[in-house]
Amino acid sequence: MAPKPPPGTSARAWDGVTPALSEWVLDAVASMGFTRMTPVQASAIPLFMAHKDVVVEAVTGSGKTLSFLIPVVEKLLRLEEPLKKHHVGAIIISPTRELASQIYNVLTSLLAFHPPSASTLKPSDDDDDAPRQKFPSSTLKVVPQLLLGGSTTPAEDLSTFLKRSPNLLVSTPGRLLELLSSPHVHCPQSSFEMLVMDEADRLLDLGFKDTLQNILRRLPKQRRTGLFSASVSEAVDQIVRVGLRNPVKVMVKVKGTSGVQDKRTPASLQMTYLTAPPTHKFPAIKHILYSLEPAPQKTIMFVSTCSGVDYLSAILPSIIGDDFQLIPLHGKHQANVREKNFNRFVNSHTPAILLTTDVASRGLDIPSVDVVIQIDPPSDPKTFIHRCGRAGRAGRKGLSVVLLHPGREEDYVSFLEVRKTPVAPYPHTLTITDADAAAATETARKAVLADRALHDRGQKAFVSWFRSYSKHQASSIFRVADLDWEGLGNAWGLLKLPKMPELRNFQGDRTLGVNLDWENYAYKDKQREKRRKEQVQENAENGVADDQAAGKKRSSESVAWSRNLDNRNKKLKRREAKQARQQKDKWEKMTEEERQKVLETEKMLEQIRVKNEEERLLRRAAKDKESKAAGGDDDDEFKGFD
């Protein structure tokens, strides 16, 4: 048994909590390596154990999980008598399968130090034949059950519940509501003690508001409720007003280097940004991964879409190299694939990269993440701190890098600073040449040329990426009009730009300089290639129809330029009118608080835009002055960063 931390007078000593923690809990936290409580634990645990409703807002990686698990377990083990069969004493709700699984794993690690509760846990395969200690039915114990949609059916969950009669449920919202709807599951006021909603704002962001309200209606009002999150939004406040009784609000912040307590991320996390043209992004990522000392063992890279994960997971390994194992993870993966890939990353003993969407940005307690790289800044700025917070957890040093395009996107730095999430320039010298960028593009295209299916995947991913980019909440910073289409296409290793309405007036090279025999460009999958050839043959046999179609196309192309321009202007006006109507409808449906928030955001963005435009003009004037003094103009070559 691990030695308990020595008694002390520190307000964060585990043995100084009032009411006092059980001896076995002190053994458990000591074994887990926690010599003293984190600030959020020191604030929340005594309150929750003292029968207070709590709303806890704290930075990611601050130890929120134990802040609610310990009070819940202590409460269930201090009842006067065991709960009746099929009566539930406590529920923990999580927004995602992965987070629910992690909470359950921490819970079972904790209960392993309480022999009566440990005896109820499902034995591992290695211990199936080992004798298990039995305890009288009158012994108080915690019997947990994990409920996850996609892993088991509701009928199987109910069968397990009836067989084991758990008194603590850890679940995602939908599967929990299904179980609570059964007449065999009981949560009366005489039995039910505590409800925990972890990552509460994410629960609402994912559309679980109605489900949560249905769950709350099935639970007694006389209960203790804990709401834990990295940020508390107006929507969360609505849940607080409905579901909590006179809650105590706990807000734990960390000091920045200036000593001002306004940072929303861990002090041990170094948050940086890197400005690079599209074609330089992937070579820059490779340079970061190979130049850091010590080399990162676990890296998370965020992109904006699921199809982006699917495509980039196929081309990035050839660019980054074999020293890093790249593992994809997104919300559209089958449940078993998500679980398998997540465990591969967590349990990897070699350098690994998790290429993922925002499914991994919240709540997941992935141990020992060294670096977070945001290839795409998140559409919702609130998500930024949650992505960064995957590194630098529990006091561990971490590095976060967000990649930005030169120009207007650099205003994102000021935008983040206003939101109390400051980022600094990437501190290490990094030089990427155009030759490096061209080599990365060539490497990616080589992979795409090997299989037409990868080309199809890339076209879909690029369109999906653009749609996500166009919906960015800070649209005055992330402007579609400023995008370098050819640079983006080359960076992604595309063989041509996809057909999409936004490129209708594009005057550049849609082929991206690639000369390809498309008729003989084949799929690796033989059956798919066979079907493609049959379609090509069918088109050839219907050549007359094709000629007629081509004639119609030529006819449309021969329309007078002025008429085409007039048609385009009419379409543009119709589109603008439609967008204006949609904006008006959206505005009318907003509450007064939501309208005020939108106005404040727009005002803030305009102030940032004006400020940065003034600074940009001053820098340009100074640069022109230096250039003239030197007797020539600077070339456009990318020279890296200091």
UniProtKB/Swiss-Prot annotation:
GO terms for biological process: assembly of large subunit precursor of preribosome; maturation of LSU-rRNA. ATP binds at A58, V59, T60, G61, S62, G63, K64, T65. A motif (Q motif) lies at residues 14-42. SMART domains: DEXDc, DUF4217, HELICc. GO terms for cellular component: 90S preribosome; nucleolus; nucleoplasm; preribosome, large subunit precursor. Residues 284-438 form the Helicase C-terminal domain. Its EC number is 3.6.4.13. Belongs to the DEAD box helicase family. DDX55/SPB4 subfamily. This is ATP-dependent rRNA helicase spb4. It comes from Aspergillus niger (strain ATCC MYA-4892 / CBS 513.88 / FGSC A1513). The lineage of its organism: Eukaryota, Fungi, Dikarya, Ascomycota, Pezizomycotina.
